[in-house]
């Protein structure tokens, strides 16, 4: 790796050099910019992708977007999924109405489809409004670390190589991450034998009615996702390796018969078609010194469940506020040590779970076929008749169930809310106006929530520490969500509870802040 002459800290090109301008890198740049951190974001491609694979935007991602004023635009451009249908042997065998699956759990209680290519365009537009431009055709060549910065060499579009300095580098550069490879971090796992394909099509038929449709009758998987616009859908499917190997390159005509037979889809126009291989891997580490790995650079897995892009965005939000806290002198650098343990545990569970799910829906064994053809179609609609089953499914898929209870940053319990849990969402009606307890989270800062009445000691303490205190009049709905009356909840900038203390104690909050080296007055 190359060396560069040192400059004073204020002469760094950026605080954070972001390598990769997919959703993960773009969201990291958005959050950091909103938090007052200087970013430089580069990408070796000449333009954003146009044949995207990711489709689902989960509720937790929308909650993160709500914090930066982006959620409404995503919901407006996306399409809510009202119901899901299972097909067996060319006929619809089961239908389950989603409705407001997560009612009372999230301000976004539904499944949303918003293609990644359109998603990226929106993120890029928002960054441009904040004065941040993605540097295209710009590639990371190498980098090295000193005691207080990262020294990188970057190849510009004209082929020249220049030096760039930043406090930290974030590898958001995908499965073939240059950052990860430069750090010699292992990426263990495997590759699925199936070849995946995705197609943007215009058509008609019973599977083009705005619902989600999934065919289970073959070892080859097929799903139809509704998009904005009449008769426009995104097809995602697989072809077993032995079939794919018979052709040098898979084309639409090779799978069109399967699509028509599985769901009676009449395709009138194919806007685009592409194929890809899917790996299931998790990096051995998500951090080395001043370098961090996020998104596909850190973990890749089957697209079953629509979790991949959302997990990368979760990585970005988790790291963004920690970068900002350290760079602004409001936290010790050890705060960054919590990124890897908080995110790698979830990534490992997710890869294992999606691997099992994908194997179940594509296995050619007799047992797997019996489960797909008989058991799942019978059970699927029944599950949605039970409120608890619906709520658990929503919490799991929406990532609102993700927690950091095992983190060194998480302490205490009040009600059923533990330190490390996502702050429960509660709707609050005041003077006939519907509000919620997530509104204060738009400050992107530490804050204290109290549901009931705050003591004068707590009010004085929060005022002296420049710590926002939000007091909500107690209601039975708060208790049902797991909150405890008059308990203190210290909430992180990303909406997770750091400390849950049942005693309404300013001393408990003071002890937490001191113990974790947090200074909120700078």
Report residues per predicted region.
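Helical substrate-recognition/capping region of FAD-dependent monooxygenase/halogenase enzymes
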Residues: 2-15, 19, 35, 44, ...
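Active-site-adjacent segment of FAD-dependent monooxygenases/related oxidoreductases
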Residues: 50-54, 58-128
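FAD/FMN-dependent oxidoreductases across multiple families
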Residues: 77, 247-311, 331-336, 344-346, ...
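A conserved short coil-to-beta-strand element within the FAD-binding core of flavoproteins
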Residues: 136-150
């Amino acid at each position: 790796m190359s060396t560069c002459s040192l400059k004073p800290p204020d002469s760094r090109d950026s605080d954070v050099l972001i390598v990769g301008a997919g959703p993960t890198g773009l969201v990291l740049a958005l959050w950091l910019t909103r938090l007052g951190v200087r970013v430089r974001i580069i990408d070796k491609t000449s333009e954003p992708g146009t044949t995207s694979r990711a489709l689902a935007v989960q509720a937790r991602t929308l909650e993160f977007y709500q914090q930066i004023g982006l959620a409404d635009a995503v919901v407006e451009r996306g399409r809510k999924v009202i119901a899901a249908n299972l097909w067996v042997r060319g006929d619809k065998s089961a239908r389950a109405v989603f409705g407001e699956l997560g009612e009372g759990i999230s301000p976004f209680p539904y499944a949303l489809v918003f293609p990644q290519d359109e998603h990226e365009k929106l993120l890029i537009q928002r960054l441009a409004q904040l004065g941040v431009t993605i540097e295209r055709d710009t590639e990371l060549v190498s980098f090295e670390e000193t005691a207080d910065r990262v020294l990188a060499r970057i190849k510009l579009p004209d082929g020249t190589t220049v030096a760039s300095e930043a406090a930290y580098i974030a590898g958001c550069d995908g499965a073939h991450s240059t950052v990860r490879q430069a750090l010699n971090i292992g990426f263990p796992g495997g590759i699925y034998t199936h070849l995946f394909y995705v197609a943007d099509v215009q058509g008609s038929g019973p599977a083009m009615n705005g619902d989600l449709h999934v065919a289970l009758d073959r070892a080859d998987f097929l799903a139809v996702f509704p998009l904005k616009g009449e008769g426009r859908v995104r097809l995602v499917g697989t072809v077993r390796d032995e079939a794919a190997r018979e052709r040098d390159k898979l084309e639409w005509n090779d799978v069109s018969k399967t699509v028509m037979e599985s769901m009676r889809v009449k395709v009138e126009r194919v806007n685009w078609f592409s194929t890809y291989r899917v790996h299931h891997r998790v990096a051995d580490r998500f951090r080395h010194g001043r370098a961090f790995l996020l998104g596909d650079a850190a973990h890749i897995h089957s697209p079953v469940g629509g979790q991949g892009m959302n997990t990368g965005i979760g990585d970005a939000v988790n790291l963004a506020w920690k970068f900002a806290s350290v760079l602004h002198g409001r936290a010790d650098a050890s705060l960054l040590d919590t990124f890897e343990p908080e995110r790698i545990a979830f990534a490992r569970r997710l890869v294992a779970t999606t691997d099992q799910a994908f194997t179940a829906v594509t296995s050619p064994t007799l047992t797997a076929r019996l489960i797909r053809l008989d058991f799942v179609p019978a059970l699927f609609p029944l599950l949605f008749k039970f409120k608890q089953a619906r709520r658990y499914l929503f919490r799991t898929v929406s990532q609102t169930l993700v927690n950091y209870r095992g983190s060194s940053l998480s302490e205490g319990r009040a009600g059923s809310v533990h330190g490390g849990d996502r702050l429960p969402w509660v709707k609050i009606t005041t003077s006939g106006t519907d509000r919620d307890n997530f509104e204060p989270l738009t400050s992107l800062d530490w804050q204290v929530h109290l549901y009931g009445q705050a003591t004068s000691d707590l009010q004085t303490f929060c005022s002296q520490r420049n710590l926002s205190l939000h007091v909500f009049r107690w209601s039975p709905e708060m208790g049902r969500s797991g909150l405890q009356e008059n308990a203190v909840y210290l909430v992180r900038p990303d909406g997770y509870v750091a400390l849950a203390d049942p005693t309404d104690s300013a001393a408990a909050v003071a002890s937490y802040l001191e113990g974790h080296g947090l200074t909120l007055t700078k």
